[in-house]
Amino acid sequence: PYIGLPVFLSRAFRHGAIYVRKASGITSPKDLEGRVVGVPEYAMTLAVWVRGILSDEYGIDTDKLKYRTGGLNEPGRTERITLNIPSHIELEDLGSSVSLNDAILDGRLDAIISPAPPQSFSDGDARVIRLIDPAGPIEREYFKRTKIFPPMHIVGIKKTTIQKYPSLPNDVYKLFLDARKIAMERVKEVAQSSANREMSPWYSEAYEYAVSIMGAEYWTYGLDNNSADLQAFCRYCYSQHLTSKLMSP
């Protein structure tokens, strides 16, 4: 068992993480109900956030999606935790020989929910399109309204290690706070430097735009700074049958 620290090493808005087979006729999020949707793992953080957003923002009953799990571009991925999903939810493994990308191209899937695009989309295959496109304006409006910048990954320390070194969680947390400060200063420095050190032509503009909407400290650690995010995630885990009771951060 691990103890989690409120240190969020990865965060991302996820409205743009839904890809659909163009011929499926899916043109809005509500159309996903009753359709066959691929996802690398039902319990992965990305999937939890997307289902939560679909429910909160679009009124979708995500239990009505027909889930197929598997590797995105390479077959064989399986759930890493044991699930206790109600029988009314259709959840099946694609198996060891078919990827989600294969399945959306051959018609077995109507859509894919994934943190990275399927290879067909990356290759410009017109048969696979992003459902919410462009996602950026909707994600920015979502943040302005909810103040949620979805956390993806956190830092964990083994309970046995903490038992040996009780001060370790606070010590590690302080180190990550220091590292975050350095990282944010570097991001600002690069954005405002006279020479572009990022291979992105509008990096400075993107940074300034993010700050104008989210504030200079847009990538925060700690429970108080992320209460809306964590409360939403706990609620999603419970409503999606991943926890037996409603947890609190």
Please tell me what each predicted stretch does.
Residues 1-63, 67-76:
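Short, glycine-/small- and polar/acidic-enriched structural segments
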Residues 28, 50, 99-100, 233:
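Residues within well-ordered alpha-helices
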Residues 34-35, 152-154, 216:
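Short, solvent-exposed beta-strand edge segments and adjacent coil->beta transition regions
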Residues 41, 90-91, 223-225:
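Residue-level marker of alpha-helix boundaries and capping positions
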Residues 59-94, 243-249:
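A local structural motif
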Residues 78-188:
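Pocket-lining segment of extracytoplasmic ligand-binding domains
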Residues 156, 161-239:
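Secondary-structure end/capping motifs
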